[in-house]
Amino acid sequence: MSLEAIKFDRSEPRKVSVKVLDQLLLPYTTKYIPVHTIDDGYRVIKNMQVRGAPAIAIVGSLSILTEVQFLQLDSQKSTQWFYDLSDWSNVNSKLLQRIEFLLSSRPTAVNLSNSLTEIRGILQNSSDLSDFDSKLFQYVCTLIDDDLANNITMGNNGAEYLLESLVQDGFQGEFGVLTICNTGSLATSGYGTALGVIRSLWAKSQSQGSENPPSKKQKKDAAPTKMVQVFPLETRPYNQGSRLTAYELVHDEIPATLITDSMVSYKIKTSPIPIKAAFVGADRIVRNGDTANKIGTFQLAIVCKQFGIKFFVVAPKTTIDNVTPSGDQIVVEERKPSEFRLVTGTAVDYVNESPILNDSQEPQSAKVGIAPPNVNVWNPAFDITPHEFIDGIVTEKGVFTKDDKGNFQLDKLF
């Protein structure tokens, strides 16, 4: 059974159902939150109950659809929200205001901004609320279906490129890879971006045999070149690596060893399995290839460069901002100090690590303080990795590498 971050029932196009997996409760509790309105979408995005740039864009778009359908089903609600359904210009103006509000939930991720720009265009070209409803439904269905298809394509593109590169470099045998944050099914419509490449690498390692003959550059009797271990970084301070990526790897039975962010240099130096690549996602890639991603990504890129490990960013075309020239212009979101000073998780028995249940027989969530409550905290959600530290950008259109001058040519995607 595949993991689902978003449950979208589209069987009734005029009465869709949207539920979002509360990722703050993972890995011990699986609970879905209904999304009926833009306010609901804003809340689950802002609170990081859903995260990952593609998933944020999907949930944001779906929340507009559910609000539009809710308005048509409940005229009383429309009055409470100050919509005048008898005046299309009023509805149009109000929706534009609501879309701007939704955009403020997570300003760094470009996917949400791109999707909302598309939706503004659909709104301006709609004759009434019913027309907008129909067009928006088609848009979100395409958004979700394309995201999944692109993820699978990116997974194969990245896996094949790495394996071919390793053979060209003269490497043969088993290897491991690094990743940070969560870029899998929980961050997308399914399969994942960077974790999708890792899934594809694992699938290829499992299927190696007569149907996958060795490359001409490989020695005839050499061990096959295959990924056998993943090293996900914990990803402080929100622990997406330990809570979510480790959860997905265990679910898919992909061999993995969880490490803290500060262990990566020593792990690379001492690992009996050579670590040959790092795959990370992106919340925004600008024109020159500079990449905004989860805090700690830049640090990982520096370490990889020191050890000669290939560093890849994996993201669809929708994550590329072809207007902003460099990472210096990216607005980096800063989170609340309490998210740093406190750790939220499931209360467990000290001896056997089983979850402690509340009165409803559900795992009990708890917050634990790990820093003085009055200490100053700096808590950026993202950092910017300069393109000089990136070996390749994996997209659904192929793998982009730098030219002889050290520049990416991402404009070829547009």
Swiss-Prot record:
Pfam families: IF-2B. One of its GO terms (molecular function) is S-methyl-5-thioribose-1-phosphate isomerase activity. Its EC number is 5.3.1.23. The keyword Amino-acid biosynthesis applies. The active site is at residue 283. Its main location: cytoplasm. Residues 205-224 are annotated as: Disordered. One of its GO terms (biological process) is L-methionine salvage from methylthioadenosine. Residues 205-215 have a biased composition (Polar residues). It catalyses: 5-(methylsulfanyl)-alpha-D-ribose 1-phosphate = 5-(methylsulfanyl)-D-ribulose 1-phosphate. It is found in: Cytoplasm; Nucleus. The keyword Isomerase applies. The record marks 181 as: Transition state stabilizer. Pathway: Amino-acid biosynthesis; L-methionine biosynthesis via salvage pathway; L-methionine from S-methyl-5-thio-alpha-D-ribose 1-phosphate: step 1/6. GO terms for cellular component: cytoplasm; nucleus. InterPro entries: IF-2B-related (IPR000649), IF-M1Pi (IPR005251), IF_2B-like_C (IPR042529), Initiation_fac_2B_a/b/d (IPR011559), M1Pi_N (IPR027363), NagB/RpiA_transferase-like (IPR037171). Keywords: Amino-acid biosynthesis, Cytoplasm, Isomerase, Methionine biosynthesis, Nucleus. Catalyzes the interconversion of methylthioribose-1-phosphate (MTR-1-P) into methylthioribulose-1-phosphate (MTRu-1-P). Belongs to the eIF-2B alpha/beta/delta subunits family. MtnA subfamily. This is Methylthioribose-1-phosphate isomerase. The gene is MRI1.
